[in-house]
Amino acid sequence: MVILEANKIRKSYGNKLNKQEVLKGIDIHIEKGEFVSIMGASGSGKTTLLNVLSSIDQVSHGTIHINGNDMTAMKEKQLAEFRKQHLGFIFQDYNLLDTLTVKENILLPLSITKLSKKEANRKFEEVAKELGIYELRDKYPNEISGGQKQRTSAGRAFIHDPSIIFADEPTGALDSKSASDLLNKLSQLNQKRNATIIMVTHDPVAASYCGRVIFIKDGQMYTQLNKGGQDRQTFFQDIMKTQGVLGGVQHEH
C-alpha cells in the first residue's frame, strides 16, 4: 500500500529575477512500513525534499498525497492539524523541552488527543521500553546524554502511531556508538510496528539500516538502491560506491 505519493515536485526560492530551483520535478512513492533514506551532496536538495514531503515547507509545483490526503490542497491550519495527528518528527538537535521530563516530552503528542491517562501511560511505557529509556522517565534533558535525548525524541515521534516519521540527520550530533544504538532501535520499531520512516542522512552507515536509499543530485532523483536480501555490510558497500560516483557526499558540512 502506497502511503506517500509525490508527483513532479518542484521547489523554487527567490523571485522572477533571481529564482533558484532547488527541486526539479521529483517523483517519489513510499510504501507503508518502508524505512527509506534520502542521500545527496550538500546543496542537492535533500533537506528541502524532506521539508516539502512533510509539509513543513510548500511545493512550488506538483502534488503530495499522504494516506490519500492531498497535502498540497490543504490550508496551513489544516496542515498543522494533520502534522500533529499523523506525522512524527526526529530532528538532529532533538527539539526537546528542557522544562519537561523525558516522560513528559514523549507524551506531548498525546496531549491533544482524547486518550485516557491510563492508555497514554501504557503507550509511553511500551515505546520507552522499546527504546531503552524507561528508566530515565523522570530525568530532564540536561541530565541525559545526546544518544538518550535522541531516543527520547524518537519516542515522542512514535508514541501517537503516526502514518510517517520524518527524520532529518537524526544521528548527526551523535558519536558512532550512540548513532548505531539509535539506528538499531529505529530499525526494530520499523519492523515491530510496521512504521514508515523517511530519513535524510549524509552517513552511509546510517543509510545501510534502511531498506531503500534514494540519491538526489542537483534537485533531481539520481538513482536508488534496494537492500533486498543483502546484509547490511554489503548494502553499505553499495551505498559507498554510489556515493563515490555522486562525489562530494562524504564531505558534507
UniProtKB/Swiss-Prot annotation:
ATP binds at residues 40-47. Induction: Expression is induced by bacitracin, via the two-component regulatory system BceS/BceR. Keywords: Antibiotic resistance, ATP-binding, Nucleotide-binding, Transport. The keyword ATP-binding applies. Part of the ABC transporter complex BceAB (TC 3.A.1.123.5) involved in bacitracin export. Responsible for energy coupling to the transport system. Belongs to the ABC transporter superfamily. The complex is composed of two ATP-binding proteins (BceA) and two transmembrane proteins (BceB). This is Bacitracin export ATP-binding protein BceA. It comes from Bacillus subtilis (strain 168). The lineage of its organism: Bacteria, Bacillati, Bacillota, Bacilli, Bacillales.
